[in-house]
């Protein structure tokens, strides 16, 4: 009979989709952080629930040849790099297998080759966006990340996967906040001023945006702080304030104020220029997002007569990337601000053959069908929850020749592909792309054709 705090010797037999080691002991399946298949460990039992348990490595008796020995385990404990203890070559194989397993288990597809994961040459310092909490640690204002499953801040200076200038701006701002004696947010007391720092950087332009998330409007001596920030970082073109006075884990409140410069930065994606606001959805790994979108374009095999529906269109990055190759792009996005951004981005890039509407994807699809718009290609890039059933049915009713599906969750994608196959489409290609090295997340693009 197992009990909490028992220490047992066991072998790790597998790895979960979230990068946890899996061990099977006395009928329990244990999940163990920082443990890899093939490793023999002494494990402390932390928690037992029915037939599921959680364990902690007390000692490694053998280690995997695929272990990344150079990783600072702070990045594991905070979740910044929950797959960082695995060598990068093995991370890419893990992600390929994850996609293949979901296709087989959920969609019952085993006859379509899942291509090797497209990876980065240098899988570090790639994120163009950072969101870091500000708290008091040992009497001093600190920035960093929360320890996993807690609100205990771990102080960090090098965030491993963020672009280095973003790290530098965060650390400089932290030091300024200390110098000007700005009080960090205290969740328990619901006191303090500064809750979070959010930084965005244009990968190609180098433009920087800093957002100060505060509990109230007034920031004492903010003009002096801004002067020092822009003097030290000439690439800062936007300093924003967001006011969030709610007792909530949501980072942004409703009110934004422009403290310096513009309320957007600019960047390029596949030759187009985009304005990016604090709230814009914009892929955090520009280099690999371009490869992902280019793969989607290649899969779609577009021509000048194609009519494309861009569902979940965001600020237009996918649809506007193909607009110059096709007859017309119809984009739909539920967030109204993103739709207005997409229209402005079309104008910014001289694109006149695109239409963007604010609506649910399934509603817009039904309206376009009634108007006699017949897409030849539907491109979708939904959130992690995937497509709604009603959208899949609406998409199938258009009888579009191709569905190009970009996914950030291969499990919900597999579920949706299963339904598309029942409605007369056939999966022909699927390509995983590593937009999030050192983490368990994987993007992929799949092509379905009308049978």
Swiss-Prot record:
It is an enzyme of class 2 (transferase). The active site is at residue 408. PROSITE patterns: SAM_MT_RNA_M5U (PS51687), TRAM (PS50926), TRMA_1 (PS01230), TRMA_2 (PS01231). The keyword Transferase applies. Keywords: Methyltransferase, S-adenosyl-L-methionine, Transferase. Residues 1-59 form the TRAM domain. S-adenosyl-L-methionine binds at residues 283, 312, 333, 381. GO terms for biological process: rRNA base methylation. One of its GO terms (molecular function) is rRNA (uridine-C5-)-methyltransferase activity. It comes from the Bacteria. InterPro entries: MeTrfase_TrmA_AS (IPR030390), MeTrfase_TrmA_CS (IPR030391), NA-bd_OB-fold (IPR012340), SAM-dependent_MTases_sf (IPR029063), TRAM_dom (IPR002792), U5_MeTrfase_fam (IPR010280). The keyword Methyltransferase applies. Pfam families: TRAM, tRNA_U5-meth_tr. Its EC number is 2.1.1.-. Belongs to the class I-like SAM-binding methyltransferase superfamily. RNA M5U methyltransferase family. This is Uncharacterized RNA methyltransferase SAG0633. It comes from Streptococcus agalactiae serotype V (strain ATCC BAA-611 / 2603 V/R).
């Amino acid at each position: 009979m197992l009990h909490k705090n028992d220490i047992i010797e066991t072998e790790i037999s597998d790895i979960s989709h979230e990068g946890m080691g899996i061990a099977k002991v006395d009928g329990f399946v244990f999940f163990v952080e920082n443990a890899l298949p093939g490793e023999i460990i002494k494990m402390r039992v932390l928690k037992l629930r029915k037939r599921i348990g959680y364990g902690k490595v007390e000692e490694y008796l053998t280690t995997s040849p695929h272990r990344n020995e150079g990783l600072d385990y702070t990045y594991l404990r905070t979740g910044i790099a929950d797959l960082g203890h695995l060598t990068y070559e093995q991370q890419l194989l893990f992600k390929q297998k994850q996609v293949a397993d979901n296709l087989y288990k959920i969609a019952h597809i085993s006859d379509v080759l899942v291509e090797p994961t497209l990876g980065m040459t240098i899988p570090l310092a790639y994120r163009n966006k950072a969101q870091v909490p500000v708290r008091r640690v040992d009497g001093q204002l600190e920035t960093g990340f929360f320890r996993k499953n807690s609100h205990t801040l771990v102080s960090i200076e090098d965030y491993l996967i963020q672009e280095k200038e973003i790290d530098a701006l965060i650390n400089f701002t932290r030091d300024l906040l200390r110098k000007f004696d700005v009080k960090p947010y205290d969740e328990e007391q619901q006191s303090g001023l500064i809750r979070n720092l959010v930084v965005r950087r244009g990968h190609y332009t180098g433009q920087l945006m800093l957002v100060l998330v505060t509990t109230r409007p007034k920031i004492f001596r903010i003009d002096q702080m801004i002067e020092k920030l822009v003097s030290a970082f000439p690439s800062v073109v936007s300093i924003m304030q967001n006011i969030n006075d709610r007792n909530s884990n949501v980072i942004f409140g409703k009110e934004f104020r422009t403290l310096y410069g513009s309320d957007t930065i600019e960047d390029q994606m596949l030759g187009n220029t985009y304005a990016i606001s604090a709230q814009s959805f914009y892929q955090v790994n520009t280099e690999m997002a371009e490869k992902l979108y280019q793969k989607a374009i290649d899969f779609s095999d577009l021509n000048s007569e194609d009519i494309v529906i861009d569902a979940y269109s965001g600020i237009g990055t996918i649809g506007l990337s193909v607009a110059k190759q096709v007859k017309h792009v119809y984009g739909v996005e539920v967030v109204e601000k993103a739709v207005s951004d997409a229209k402005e981005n079309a104008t910014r890039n001289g694109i006149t053959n695109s239409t963007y509407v604010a609506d649910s994807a399934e509603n817009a699809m039904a309206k376009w069908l009634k108007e006699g718009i017949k897409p030849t290609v539907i491109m979708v890039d939904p959130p992690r929850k995937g497509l709604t059933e009603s959208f899949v049915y609406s998409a199938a009713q258009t009888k579009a020749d191709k569905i190009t599906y970009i996914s950030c969750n291969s499990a919900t994608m597999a579920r949706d592909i299963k339904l598309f196959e029942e409605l007369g489409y056939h999966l022909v290609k699927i390509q995983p792309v590593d937009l999030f090295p050192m983490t368990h997340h994987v993007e992929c693009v799949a092509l379905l054709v009308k049978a």
